[in-house]
Amino acid sequence: GVPEVIEREMQQQAIPQSPKLEIVPAYQVVDMNDSGLDAVRKKKDSSISRAVDLVKDRMADAVVSAGHTGAAVTASLIKLRTLPHIERPAIAAIMPSRSHHWVLIDAGANPDSLPGHLVQNALMGSAYARHVLGRDNPRVGLMSNGTEEEKGNALCKETSKLLRTTPGINFIGNIEGHDLWETPPDVVVCDGFTGNIILKMAESLYDISRE
């Protein structure tokens, strides 16, 4: 970001200077109305673009962003690429429940997905649950409007068939909205449109509960 702005904010927040903290200059600003592609192609001197460049050049291990989600995803896709055999990136959100934390994937990266993309989401979500949440054999559920196999739209029905036959996925079947907060599986798979609605609804319910 802009060094002068960052240093001023650090002073206001009483954050001390440290040799472990390096400010990397970046002077362009990604507006929330920018498209993700325009933000990456036209604003190469933005903080998100510079941050992803640092990971690409092995000068950083990870990027944390509270800004434009589309720009962060697009920059990562263009500069870092995806894992082998993964066609599209996905956003994984760690969600709470009464019993345990679980992975929601996709939480908004791809509003329009094909069944194969959701299977890839299940594989990525399972890997995250296994290595980060410590679940030995993560249980995977598919978000639908009913637990029966015949329930759901065309995307859900075809995805369900693929999940049942894909090695490496511990698929437990379809789940419904009320399952999310009581006893959800370790990984909940859905398209980005549905996942983003779930995420935003959860945020609003939390805000209401605090009032």
Identify the role of each PLM range:
Residues 1, 24, 65-67, 94-95, ...:
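Short beta-strand segments
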Residues 1-8, 13:
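N-terminal phosphate-binding or glycine-rich loops at protein starts, especially the Walker A/P-loop
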Residues 4, 111-177, 186:
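Glycine-rich phosphate/diphosphate-binding loop of Rossmann-like nucleotide-binding domains
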Residues 6-7, 45-58, 62-76, 83, ...:
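Short glycine/serine/threonine-rich phosphate/pyrophosphate-binding segments
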Residues 15-60:
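Phosphate/nucleotide-donor binding subsite
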Residues 21, 102, 169:
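Short, conserved active-site loop motifs that form the nucleotide-linked donor/cofactor pocket
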Residues 28-29, 68-70, 78, 145-148, ...:
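Short glycine-rich anion-binding loops that position phosphate/pyrophosphate groups of nucleotides
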Residues 77-90, 94-104, 182-211:
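Glycine-rich phosphate/nucleotide-binding loop
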